[in-house]
């Protein structure tokens, strides 16, 4: 798809990423908490949309969202059972891991080169790509590095063939090699793809569309998605390969290849979830050799062993959800199960339990607080809650209205508990740092509440400066990554967290993408300000369709910048932590793939929960 000119946006690029947490002046008056036990006024100061209002038991007329209740029956979650915790499955997995390590090692020069020098490069790349896409790569990190070091030692400006002694370069091997090496931090240039153009500077194909050619173009498509800013050849590769693959789907029979193409065209890279891809890939993976069969068997056994862990974690999350009274909050979205599913689709190492549960809880907070601040709460209640959070004092819970008390204590207890969990890894108390991250988040919410109350529509830049904070991506990322097992000194943490460009890119991307999916529903609830409406305000005469088109073009370009911030060489930040933050960005991007996947569980989201959490894979 061709890129769109975004000339009106160029002038705001410099301010787009400057001082993201420098808030504009707002009324700083804090309610007197000593007097807060007095009866609260029954008159809200937020404007009410007549189409989305309801009278609560307290007599206050409030705006409410049109949300459905929890889609997942608690009894169903409590009754989840699995036999894959049995020692026999763990033992089988260990046996398969050793067999596959032997296969990796058999490709080494020191072992006599049991594979041909005409295919040795592609065989190594195929093995690395296979274990990664099947979701079992955590067992083979040393083997992966050894294989890629070998491939890189034969990398040339014109690409590679299938083997080190191949006479000609090969698109499939080169595209797969380029993608895999770049993702693993090797310094490879996209200029290598120029060698697969014709004399007119165009990517070409034979027209026959053999399976080998199709797979080559498929890997070209995969490679094109990890483009850096300014890489024109990657844009051209994406356009060419997308058109080619869509055309191929119309010609080839339904097969494992067609299913693979459909999946990759659908989810690409920035909306792909590794566990979902693994679930798809094990269904279409070839099993013609004993080693291919062992790869698939290990993937399935590991999938189901992890499924047994998911069961326990999901049951724990449900108990937490009930303990703090969230089921009684009928005005808000109940999508904690979905958030846990998303987390377990990107963090598949059993050791990352704190990350998965932490992300699910933080995301649930962001959702509930969004519904309170944007829709349900009165200005007086919001000021009380904000002041109480900033004081970080549980005794102040008595000052809050009933529906806020459980939310306050859930935030207070969970943030404190996660700080203790992080201290085991970081060797220092991070609570104060985390609290400082929460404060601008609530300040941003208060600004939006005042916009809603007064009917004020800000400029696009004013809106973005504030709303990229209120989106809450920093809240959902910060504490989970502190539990990952990698010590992050303060100066390193700030290269992932605020004030890094990496953090800001994620915040801006998700706000822009989310608004293109949510702005109509938000407007119906009385929330006029969105990137779409504010952009239209700044550009009189522009239609909604044009505004969305231009914002999507912004997102497309910003994704390239995010690729660079993630993969740029000579970075001090552990790639595992940066990748975890990037994966959280992919989670939210995935939810906005077709529509607002967080306003209500979509068919796609429900299928995701069933396919990756509730149902084991048949062995």
Swiss-Prot record:
Keywords: Chloroplast, Lyase, Magnesium, Metal-binding, Plastid, Transit peptide
Recorded coiled-coil stretches: none
EC number: 4.2.3.117, 4.2.3.121, 4.2.3.119, 4.2.3.120
Residues at which Mg(2+) 2 binds: 370, 374
Keyword Electron transport belongs to the record: no
Pathway terms, separated by semicolons: Terpene metabolism; oleoresin biosynthesis; Secondary metabolite biosynthesis; terpenoid biosynthesis
Highest rank taxon of the organism: Eukaryota
Pfam families reported in the protein's UniProt record: Terpene_synth, Terpene_synth_C
Catalysis: reaction(s): (2E)-geranyl diphosphate = (1S,4R)-camphene + diphosphate; (2E)-geranyl diphosphate = (1R,5R)-alpha-pinene + diphosphate; (2E)-geranyl diphosphate = tricyclene + diphosphate; (2E)-geranyl diphosphate = beta-myrcene + diphosphate
Cofactor notes: Binds 3 Mg(2+) or Mn(2+) ions per subunit.
Membership in a protein family: Belongs to the terpene synthase family. Tpsd subfamily.
Entry's free-text remark on domains: The Asp-Asp-Xaa-Xaa-Asp/Glu (DDXXD/E) motif is important for the catalytic activity, presumably through binding to Mg(2+).
Function as written in the Swiss-Prot or TrEMBL entry: Monoterpene synthase (TPS) involved in the biosynthesis of monoterpene natural products included in conifer oleoresin secretions and volatile emissions; these compounds contribute to biotic and abiotic stress defense against herbivores and pathogens. Catalyzes the conversion of (2E)-geranyl diphosphate (GPP) to (-)-camphene, (+)-alpha-pinene and (-)-alpha-pinene, and, to a lower extent, to tricyclene, myrcene and (-)-beta-pinene.
Protein name per the record: (-)-camphene synthase, chloroplastic
Source species: Pinus contorta
